[in-house]
Amino acid sequence: MKRTFIMVLDSFGIGASADAKKFGDEGADTLGHIAEACARGEANVGRSGPLTLPNLSRLGLGKAAEESTGTFPVGLDKNADIIGAYGYASELSSGKDTPSGHWEIAGVPVLFDWGYFSDVENSFPQELLDKLVKRANLSGYLGNCHSSGTVILDQLGEEHMKTGKPIFYTSADSVFQIACHEETFGLDRLYELCEIAREELTDGGYNIGRVIARPFIGDKPGHFQRTGNRHDLAVEPPAPTMLKKLVDEKGGEVVSIGKIADIYAQVGITQKVKATGLDALFDATIEEMKKAGDNTIVFTNFVDFDSSYGHRRDVAGYAAALELFDRRLPELMALIKEDDILILTADHGCDPTWPGTDHTREHIPVLVYGPKVKPGSLGHRETFADIGQTVAAYFGLSPMDYGKNML
């Protein structure tokens, strides 16, 4: 019975890539800088002391990071008994965004340039805004700028509730984000507005990767909270991913947990499971692993590392989340059967010590575990697509155009 379980620790980079300077990210290191902050006692909110990741260390995380940066992460166990194959991968794709990273993991790197809204203020073309106002029958809009999602809620949330005007904002990523109050504006209306925005962006040739619905609740600044009803409207990958090939060539199952289905625009996904928060995502993953049959991929995105801690530059929160993930990892590993493969990886970096609020261009860890996986170094992988090629080979699928089998 062949089953693969892919866990993406969203934004968990392990050191700047060779081309990081081009992105303004030279020297970024999500894992390394979190570990250093913990060792200095600068991440003692909700946790304390050095970063402690014994289970990830046994899978080779520390050694993969050392291969990536030349420095072993402080606090991690240098003498851990290695039980998995480990390495680090560079990104071939042109961006450092979520779709690019995930598509490349699935064997389809993004070799074109996304469109971006690069102006920090008045970010969106007036023609686009006018069409959205007209088609969605809006009284106007707020924002129209670059912002962190939580900051803009405190700035404009109250005005949005009073006026009913949606909050439009973007970032350094190829995104058009719309924040609206679940109760005063309505979730269905927000989703409809996002569908209209997706159509207008596509028809207008803007080449924007995602429209993201950002629903929130609360009644005043400091009390606004984003809910778990986020919805991403992505464009489809430009070629068949290994997910789609498993479904088409083997009649296999691909179970999406968290935002995976949205990232791949639902293509190559046979089941969707919604869950919000690290523990809930873990619980859902464990349940689906227990049920998984032959020719199945269970694919989970642990978004909180990125959305709750990376972008918000919350070092202590990121460290605590990593330690929670590590504590729960044995539950997951206990479900691995004779022919199974477990892959732990990331899609980009988001160094919480780095200036700004955006992603960072970094290597990702590639940790592979299973009874038939030989422990040891996989070295430097030149593309995330090595993961997709490895999975394709494991299931006996037609080869991907990019990547090399690691096993």
Curated annotation (Swiss-Prot):
Cellular-component GO terms for this entry: cytosol
GO BP annotations, alphabetical order: 2-deoxyribose 1-phosphate catabolic process; 5-phosphoribose 1-diphosphate biosynthetic process; metabolic compound salvage; nucleotide metabolic process
A GO molecular function held by the record: manganese ion binding
InterPro entries in the record: Alkaline_phosphatase_core_sf (IPR017850), DeoB (IPR010045), Metalloenzyme (IPR006124), Phosphopentomutase_DeoB_cap_sf (IPR024052)
Subcellular locations according to the entry: Cytoplasm
Essential cofactor(s): Mn(2+)
Disulphide-bonded residues: none
Binding site for Mn(2+) 1: D10, D347, H348
Cofactor comment text: Binds 2 manganese ions.
Catalytic activity: 2-deoxy-alpha-D-ribose 1-phosphate = 2-deoxy-D-ribose 5-phosphate; alpha-D-ribose 1-phosphate = D-ribose 5-phosphate
Annotated binding of Mn(2+) 2, by residue: D306, H311, H359
E.C. designation(s): 5.4.2.7
Keywords: Cytoplasm, Isomerase, Manganese, Metal-binding
Family (UniProt): Belongs to the phosphopentomutase family.
Function: Isomerase that catalyzes the conversion of deoxy-ribose 1-phosphate (dRib-1-P) and ribose 1-phosphate (Rib-1-P) to deoxy-ribose 5-phosphate (dRib-5-P) and ribose 5-phosphate (Rib-5-P), respectively.
Protein's UniProt name: Phosphopentomutase
Organism: Yersinia pestis bv. Antiqua (strain Angola)
Gene symbol of the encoding locus: deoB
